[in-house]
């Protein structure tokens, strides 16, 4: 455990001599290289000399991390050559498995691999069902929108991530038949199970905003969204093109993936325009660009501690707050917002519009016997077990777990689900309880992140606050390294392979 904390500590270390490395690709214009005061450092006295001697160049990160990465690789060696999982051929014959996992996203891969690593399953005992050809690291699309990552670098072929010991059905799901312990695939085949894990994520409904699909598809429009692979790289080009006018960033009412993401791209765009001389936070009225945040929610963030910090930041930086403004239509350069309680709709003119569409459960989940009234898989908030069918489980975005829908949440949900499922297979009572942990590394500018961590009830549960006594509501450069470098690396290196448990570190 000490090794893992040392690794994380290196990402927490202040890199004050390299402000330019945080600038957006084309916005490294004339940024004044001012040194951050020692009051913002985590350990200003003990490591000042170490910083001077060894950390003058940002590339030293790789040199310092090398022995730790090597030690981790030795502890969890990868096969020098691995065979690909093969998709099951089309056949009308019913197949049976001990566990069927519906979904090959973050939750599906983490859970299926954790089950396999238990050593209790033979070849084809576990089946994974997913129609996708590619797996995407979706939290990275914010960085694509900010111009610091490419979307191609953040995806992997699905077959490369599926262990060859799994039976992989590269198909959609037609129906759930929980009374018969089976599902039907999109091609009509039937698959039987002893236990079912339903983790297909949620769908993004671009059609929920009238005119949005057409605006996104128009290469000449300055309308974009970080929430899709086909649109996330359009975001930065729109930010670059805007020289003056009104920029509006939206967030819908209701459930979405990572409720902090709509703000992340706002703050990165603001910082870009600030560096380009197009926005002055201290005097926004005189700036060529005006910035508004239109959210269907009543506040900046649902967790009170971080919501207060972000509201103070909004006011300090001169961003207009349009609360309980839910985008319903885009027509040319006009955006129309619904208001609560029958109030009259509001129409605003824009020159740039970043849209977060409404989201919700897939129809094959919503219309099934597994769903609650809202359409999510109805599970116990602690055990992740279905409230009606004892051999059905769910986690992640598709579940009814009343917490934020983030990849970080899955790092805590998956071990609980796997532990309880295995005990259930042995005829034992479930005894692991999920506490609602979730996290949102909220980028507040190029080079700084506010690291929100919380559990059920909106109560902060801060990893580094506990370890080092720091306030994670204060944006820090060290957290930016986690967001930009560490999290994408550990995601594909460990999380989807079932060996990363978030704040608890690596697992066997």
Briefly describe each language-model feature range:
Residues 121-125, 164-175, 270, 274-374, ...:
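A Rossmann-like FAD-binding core segment of flavoenzymes
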């Amino acid at each position: 455990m000490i090794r893992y904390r040392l690794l994380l500590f290196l990402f927490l270390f202040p890199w004050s001599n390299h402000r330019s490395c945080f600038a957006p690709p084309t916005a490294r214009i004339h940024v004044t290289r001012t040194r951050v005061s020692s009051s913002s450092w985590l350990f200003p006295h003990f490591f000042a000399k170490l910083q001077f001697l060894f950390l003058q160049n940002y590339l030293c990160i790789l040199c310092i991390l090398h022995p730790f990465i090597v030690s981790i690789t030795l502890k969890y060696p990868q096969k020098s050559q691995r065979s690909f999982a093969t998709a099951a051929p089309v056949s009308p014959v019913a197949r049976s498995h001990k566990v069927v996992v519906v979904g090959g996203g973050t939750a599906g891969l983490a859970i299926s691999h954790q089950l396999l690593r238990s050593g209790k399953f033979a070849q084809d005992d576990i089946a994974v069902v997913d129609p996708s050809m590619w797996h995407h690291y979706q939290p990275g699309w914010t960085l694509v929108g900010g111009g610091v990552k490419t979307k191609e670098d953040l995806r992997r072929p699905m077959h490369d991530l599926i262990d060859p010991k799994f039976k992989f059905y590269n198909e959609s799901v037609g129906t759930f038949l929980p009374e018969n312990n089976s599902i039907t695939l999109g091609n009509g085949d039937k698959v039987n199970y002893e236990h079912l894990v339903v983790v297909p994520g949620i769908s993004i409904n671009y059609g929920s905003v009238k005119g949005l699909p057409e605006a996104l598809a128009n290469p000449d429009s300055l309308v974009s969204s970080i929430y899709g692979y086909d649109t996330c790289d359009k975001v930065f080009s729109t930010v670059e093109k805007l020289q003056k006018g009104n920029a509006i960033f939206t967030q819908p009412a209701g459930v979405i993936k990572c409720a902090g993401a709509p703000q992340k791209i706002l703050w990165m765009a603001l910082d870009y325009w600030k560096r380009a001389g197009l926005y002055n936070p201290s005097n926004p009225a005189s700036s060529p660009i005006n910035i508004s945040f239109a959210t269907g929610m009543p506040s900046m963030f649902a967790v009170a501690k971080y919501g207060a910090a972000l509201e103070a930041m909004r006011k300090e930086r001169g961003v207009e707050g349009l609360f309980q403004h839910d985008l319903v239509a885009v027509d040319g350069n006009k955006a129309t917002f619904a208001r609560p309680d029958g109030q009259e709709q509001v129409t605003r003119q824009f020159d740039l519009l970043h849209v977060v569409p409404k989201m919700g459960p897939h129809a094959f989940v919503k219309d099934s016997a597994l769903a609650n009234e809202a359409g999510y898989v109805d599970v116990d908030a602690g055990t992740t077990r279905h409230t009606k069918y004892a051999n059905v489980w769910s986690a992640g975005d598709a579940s009814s777990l009343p917490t934020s829908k983030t990849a970080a949440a899955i790092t805590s949900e998956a071990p609980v689900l796997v532990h309880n499922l295995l005990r259930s297979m042995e005829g034992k009572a479930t005894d692991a309880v999920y506490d609602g942990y979730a996290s949102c590394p909220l980028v507040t500018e190029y080079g700084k992140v506010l690291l929100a961590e919380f559990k059920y009830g909106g109560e902060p549960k801060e990893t580094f606050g506990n370890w080092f006594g720091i306030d994670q509501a204060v944006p820090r450069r060290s957290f930016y390294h986690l967001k930009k470098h560490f999290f994408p690396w550990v995601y594909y290196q460990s999380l989807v392979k079932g060996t990363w448990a978030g704040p608890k570190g690596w697992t066997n």
